[in-house]
């Protein structure tokens, strides 16, 4: 026991044969003084109290009050070091986890940036190829792309066909393919100011309503300008030459007979049944496609 410990009543220091006790009010008594006072009452402050015998088996928290400062510093320094080491180990573990997570996220970000750059490069090349194809399609010499939303009568109104006979055209007909002049060539999907197109020459043919499903009748008659409409394409064929009004025997051919098709335009399928627009110079016919013919008859 420390040398500063003594009895608070008789002031005698502890020795081998004496025992000291501690009250909960903080006073120390030797056995002799403790026996002289009342039970459960402090001799100094007269307050109700409880006493604890000071020995090697006393609680460590109580023994700490009688230890030297150096011993207490060493004890608490050691405990503090253990606490610091424990906390530091867990901090390092948490820090290692976050570093690994950050490394994975940085790698994922790097891959994402690389993928975005590749996609942008592919997009740029595809846009270049698309622009090239678009420009090549828009500059085709035979035909033009018509907008799908425009109607057939509007396109027919914007196109004038010149089929008046001339010596030059007669010589061309005798040689083979016929030519028609279209006043107003294509502009913004419409036929605009002057386009000459070559078509297959089939003399003296007129297209009429098919009596048998899947077939169309082509008979000898006045020259006609035929527009064949299917769900995907608009086919323009020019049947010219010959004398007007002369009729001979009819000839039945399968639909889409083997005829040279000179000009193709994208077009939407015409609604309704067979529509015919006639002028003094030309007969324009809108037959349904083969699939619709089979359904209609």
Swiss-Prot record:
Keywords, sorted A to Z: Chromosome, Coiled coil, Meiosis, Metal-binding, Nucleus, Transferase, Ubl conjugation pathway, Zinc, Zinc-finger
PROSITE patterns assigned: ZF_RING_1, ZF_RING_2
InterPro entries attached to this UniProt entry: Zip3/RNF212-like, Znf_RING, Znf_RING_CS
Name assigned to this protein: Probable E3 SUMO-protein ligase RNF212
Zn finger limits (RING-type): 7-46
Enzyme class: transferase
Subcellular location as annotated: Nucleus; Chromosome
Function: SUMO E3 ligase that acts as a regulator of crossing-over during meiosis: required to couple chromosome synapsis to the formation of crossover-specific recombination complexes. Localizes to recombination sites and stabilizes meiosis-specific recombination factors, such as MutS-gamma complex proteins (MSH4 and MSH5) and TEX11. May mediate sumoylation of target proteins MSH4 and/or MSH5, leading to enhance their binding to recombination sites.
E.C. number(s) listed in UniProt: 2.3.2.-
One MF annotation (Gene Ontology) recorded for this entry: SUMO transferase activity
Presence of the UniProt keyword Metal-binding in the record: yes
PANTHER family xrefs: E3 SUMO-PROTEIN LIGASE RNF212-RELATED, RING FINGER PROTEIN NARYA-RELATED
Parts forming coiled coils: 91-124
Source species of the chain: Homo sapiens
GO BP annotations listed: chiasma assembly; homologous chromosome pairing at meiosis; meiotic gene conversion; protein sumoylation; reciprocal meiotic recombination
């Amino acid at each position: 026991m420390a040398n500063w410990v003594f009895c608070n009543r008789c002031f005698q220091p502890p020795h081998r044969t004496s025992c000291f006790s501690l009250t909960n009010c903080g006073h120390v008594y030797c056995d002799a003084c403790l026996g002289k006072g009342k039970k459960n009452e402090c001799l100094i402050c007269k307050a109700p109290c409880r006493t604890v015998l000071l020995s090697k088996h006393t609680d460590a928290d109580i023994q700490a009050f009688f230890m030297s400062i150096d011993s207490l510093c060493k004890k608490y320094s050691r405990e503090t070091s253990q606490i610091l080491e424990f906390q530091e180990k867990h901090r390092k573990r948490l820090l290692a986890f976050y570093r690994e997570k950050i490394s994975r996220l940085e790698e994922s970000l790097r891959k994402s940036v690389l993928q975005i750059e590749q996609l942008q490069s592919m997009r740029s090349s595809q846009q270049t190829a698309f622009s090239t194809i678009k420009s090549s399609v828009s500059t085709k010499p035979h035909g033009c792309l018509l907008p799908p939303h425009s109607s057939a009568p509007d396109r027919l109104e914007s196109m004038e066909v010149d089929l008046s006979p001339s010596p030059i055209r007669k010589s061309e007909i005798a040689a083979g393919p016929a030519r028609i002049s279209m006043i107003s060539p294509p502009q913004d999907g419409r036929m605009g100011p002057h386009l000459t197109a070559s078509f297959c020459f089939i003399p003296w043919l007129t297209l009429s309503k098919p009596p048998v499903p899947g077939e169309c009748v082509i008979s000898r008659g006045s020259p006609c300008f035929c527009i064949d409409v299917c769900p995907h394409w608009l086919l323009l064929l020019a049947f010219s030459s010959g004398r007007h009004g002369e009729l001979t025997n009819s000839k039945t051919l399968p639909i889409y007979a083997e005829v040279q098709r000179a000009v193709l335009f994208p077009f939407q399928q015409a609604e309704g049944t067979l529509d015919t627009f006639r002028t003094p110079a030309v007969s324009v016919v809108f037959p349904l496609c083969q699939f619709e013919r089979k359904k209609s008859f």
